[in-house]
Amino acid sequence: GGKIEDYTGADKSSRAYPLIAVTTTAGTGSECTSDYVVVDEAQNRKYGNSDRNVLPVLAVDDYELMMNMPASLTAGTGMDALTHAVEAYCSIDGALITSELAAAAVRLIFEHLEPAVISPDRKSREGMAVAQFLAGLAFGNAGCGLIHSMSHQLSAVYDLPHGLCNAILMPEGSRANRKAPEAEERYAALCEAVFPIESRDMTTGERADYLIERIEKLSEAVGTKRKLSELGVKMEDLSLLADKTLLDASLRHNIYKPDKEEIETIFRSLM
């Protein structure tokens, strides 16, 4: 009972109900996490929350149910899954199991997302169904980070698709995170796990750069590389968006702690 606002935060419910989740998109990982969002339309704010009682007792990931997804939805949800995996891999709360799940998800997404968008078949749909599940397990274990914290504000203030916002923010958000030395090492390690042949003779910095470049190229290939201004984002709102980002729960998992000016700079660079 009560108002939906009563359930913002962590473990606010009093009891669990048996929940069976059947996914129809390949992106959110909601069938295997205890996370959910609440949108406060009055304040244009999106809250990330977690409650052990919302974790499904059974999850059904059947790629047959995803066969008719439109290309734009496939691209957006797929890039959301990629963001889950990359941010979980770099999370300060990650462990070995996080890294293994996230790396496997990233490999599958780079293999299957573009075909699933351009010429979907059973192989690409199944690959993305598995990838988003693994990514969900990864971020359910270690959380997300800066990119999700910024994305939440864009989708709340402007009612924009969450996955598209993640896709737009991921390259520049990742470059900002590289200011932390340990972050560069994490991006480099993920690059080596996903692109072992291509990155064989690269330095740590080159591997981190290469991974981010490949993310950007994938976003362009599936049609999610856009300017924020094209989507109605206003320059005069960037300060407010940065303030809201700093309050977002996902930011606590991030490997680098940006200040308001840095967050504004990222938004501005994408206008």
Predicted regions, residues:
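A glycine/threonine-rich phosphate-anchoring loop and its flanking beta-alpha core
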Residues: 1-94, 185-189, 193
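Glycine-rich phosphate/pyrophosphate-binding beta-alpha loops
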Residues: 27-28, 133-166, 248-252
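C-terminal and late-domain segments of enzyme folds
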Residues: 71-134, 138
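Short alpha-helical scaffolding segments that buttress acidic/His motifs in well-ordered protein cores
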Residues: 82-86, 128-136, 170, 215, ...
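Flexible, glycine/charged-enriched surface loops at secondary-structure junctions
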Residues: 93-101, 116-127, 142-147, 201-208, ...
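Gly/Pro-rich interdomain helix-loop hinge
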Residues: 157-237
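Short, amphipathic C-terminal "tail helix"
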Residues: 234-271
